[in-house]
Amino acid sequence: KKINNHADISTYTLLYQRLVGAKVIFGRKFMRHKQWEMNHVANYLLENAGNGRILDIGCSTGYLTNHLSKQFGPGIVSGADISLASIQRNRSLFDKINFYHIDNNFYQEHKRKYAAITLMHVLEHIEKPVPFLKNIIKLLDENGILVVSVPQERIRGDLALFENIYNLFRGKFKNVHLRNYTYDTLNTELTKAGLNIQYHKYNNMLNRSSNKQSLTNHALIVYTKANKNLEPPIGPKA
């Protein structure tokens, strides 16, 4: 079953999400690069998003949602995901945060507007990225920020090794990462959707301060606004 023609929901079982969660814990507690990524997003939004609501789309295990809620407050930050099992799990673990299940009518029926929406390691899973991004733009307020983070892989799928092995055991012979983004290819899709990059950060696995292309990069984070809402951004302090 597909959600809004964008992703195959059967891939993202609770066990799959727990594999992702284990990687996040390893990247936060041992390698530290995941913590750097989360901190960078939080710091940028603290300086640029004002006091408006924040929605974490593709929240998975809820780690970023919870991290942001500690910075902004649980009444400000919400999470959303296509996996109902993950949403139910997150609601029990983080009971002060609102979590929404993304069903086939979510983007048409969800009435709230957000000062910022985060889309962390989601776009590479989406079959039709441009229509997907256009749906998300509708949820932004007039000056809203869309944060997009995508893996920086040497070979497509090398940062989703365990997820791909898990899928092989399930008889799914499809790379969970449908494309490998560079800055230019990501910018092309964002531009087609009506978004303009305001600021970007390469998240390096070994060097927090690095912001250049490298074989040791883990992710590329871009901070965007709809084309009608352009203004000079304030770079984060860390």
Predicted regions span which residues?
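Short, motif-level signal for alpha-helix interfacial/capping segments enriched in acidic residues
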Residues: 59-60, 160-162, 192
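A short glycine-rich, Lys/Arg-flanked "PGG" loop and its adjoining helix->strand segment in the class I
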Residues: 131-142
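Conserved class I S-adenosyl-L-methionine
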Residues: 147-168
